[in-house]
Amino acid sequence: MRTGIIAQKIGMTSVFNDKGERIALTLVKVDDCQVVGHKTLEKHGYNALVIGVKDKKISRVTKPMKQVFANAKISPKTKLKEFRISEENFIDVAASLEVDHFMAGQFVDITAITIGKGFAGSMKRHNFRGLEASHGVSISHRSHGSTGQRQDPGKVFKGKKMAGHMGCNQVTIQNLKIFAVDKDRKLIMIQGSIPGHKNSYLSIKDAIKKISITI
C-alpha cells in the first residue's frame, strides 16, 4: 500500500471519445506536494507518511509547526494529511510528489469535503416525499411528519431523520477512473464528479477495491 497525494479541485469540463460519447471530467491540480514527515511502527504504532501541499507564509505558521517544517527542510505547507503505507513504501522527507504518481486508466479513491448547504428541510436532506398537497393538509406540505411516539418512550430517538445542517461532510468516492494526466500543467483529469467546491482540497489514493489498470 503506497501513499496518496493531496490535490486541489479546479473545476469540470467534458470531452468526446472515439464513439462520440460525452465524458464528464473533473480537473484537479497537484502543486508543491511534498513529504513532511514519517510515522513509524516502532514510534507511533503504524506506518504513514505526512504529506503537505501548497506553500504558506511563514508568518502564518505556529511556532511548533515552524520547527516541523524546519526539520524537514521545506517551506511551510497550507494543508497536511497522513496516508497509511506499507513498510516498503516509505519516501524520503522533502521528496516531491508529482501528477505522474498516478497514470491514465488507473482507478482511485478520492476523499473530500462536500459543499455546505446550510439548514435544509427533510425533503432536500433525506429525500422525504412530504405530506399531501391537499385533503386537509395545511402549511405542513414539506414537513417530515411525526418525530416520536407518546409518553413512552417520551423522547426522540438518536439518528431520527429530521431537518438540519446539510453538507460539509467528509465523503469518499471509490473507483473513479483517471482519464488523463497532464504533467506540464500539473493536472489530473478524473472521470465523473468529485465532492467539494472549486479550489477545495482533496486526497487521492489507489483504489482498494479495484486495482486493474486499463490504458
UniProtKB/Swiss-Prot annotation:
Disulfide bonds: none annotated. Methylated by PrmB. Gene3D superfamilies: 3.30.160.810, Translation factors (2.40.30.10). Residues 136-155 are annotated as: Disordered. GO terms for molecular function: rRNA binding; structural constituent of ribosome. InterPro entries: Ribosomal_uL3 (IPR000597), Ribosomal_uL3_bac/org-type (IPR019927), Ribosomal_uL3_CS (IPR019926), Transl_B-barrel_sf (IPR009000). It holds the Pfam family Ribosomal_L3. One of its GO terms (biological process) is translation. It comes from the Bacteria. The keyword Ribonucleoprotein applies. GO terms for cellular component: ribonucleoprotein complex; ribosome. Keywords: Methylation, Ribonucleoprotein, Ribosomal protein, RNA-binding, rRNA-binding. Coiled coil: none annotated. The modification N5-methylglutamine is found at Q151. Part of the 50S ribosomal subunit. Forms a cluster with proteins L14 and L19. Belongs to the universal ribosomal protein uL3 family. HAMAP family: Ribosomal_uL3_B (MF_01325_B). NCBIfam families: L3_bact. One of the primary rRNA binding proteins, it binds directly near the 3'-end of the 23S rRNA, where it nucleates assembly of the 50S subunit. This is Large ribosomal subunit protein uL3. It comes from Rickettsia canadensis (strain McKiel). The lineage of its organism: Bacteria, Pseudomonadati, Pseudomonadota, Alphaproteobacteria, Rickettsiales.
